Amino acid sequence: GTSVIRVGAGGIMLPNHSPMVIAEQFGTLATLFPNRIDLGLGRAPGTDQRTLQALRRGPESSEYFPQDVLELQALLGTPQENQSIHAIPGEGTNVPLWILGSSLYGAQLAGMLGLPYAFASHFAPQAMAQAVSIYRERFEPSAQLSKPHVMIGCNIIVADTEEDARKLFTSPQQQFTRMVRGTRGKLPPPVDDIESFWSPAEKEQVSSMLTCSFF
């Protein structure tokens, strides 16, 4: 096993969960693996209406995202004298929070709260530069972070040759095309001819979404 690699969540969609439940779950992880857990928080529901109903959540849940982040932060932090609700385990673990986003909203919120910001380039690569700029402009130092800290989520394909890497890349290209079409499924295997899979319009849209890709 490892003893230093940081682990945690690349994305808990907080509107789908109670801050109390997340505090207890990640408090458990932080108790088992002290100082090794990170918690990334997203605002998007990340699912359809039926699944939202099954989770007993509604589309309006995302409106409370800033309040939920602050509540979660308080539950994971040092308990206050008048605090009546406690997450056990969780309380006092101070699990580092990240704000995940692909919009200017997330960038502003992360900056205002003094939290690190992770940008999802595969959703809105065109907004990346502006989002990072706004985050840095709006950043306020906090107990967790003294200066801005940005992470960019991008696609990196590694193989023996660039030709092999580009063939492997046809798997996410197909998957994103399916997403554009509104269909779901497992990650498809690579294909020799991606051009026969998508239409010119789909190619343009998917290629735009996957701009931040490196071989």
Per-range role (PLM):
Residues 29, 65, 98, 102, ...:
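Catalytic alpha/beta core domains of metabolic enzymes, predominantly
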Residues 1-5:
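N-terminal beta1-alpha1-beta2 module of alpha/beta enzyme domains
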Residues 11-19, 91-101, 159, 209-215:
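Active-site mouth loops of central-metabolism enzymes
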Residues 59-86, 127-215:
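An alpha-helical appendage that flanks or caps ligand/catalytic pockets
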Residues 7, 37-39, 97, 117, ...:
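Hydrophobic/aromatic residues located in beta-strands of well-ordered beta-sheets
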Residues 14-77, 117, 125:
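Flexible, glycine-rich active-site loops centered on histidine and acidic residues
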Residues 105-126, 131-132:
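A conserved active-site cap/scaffold subdomain adjacent to cofactor or substrate pockets
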Residues 12-14, 42-46, 102, 122, ...:
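Active-site beta-loop-alpha junctions enriched in small/polar residues
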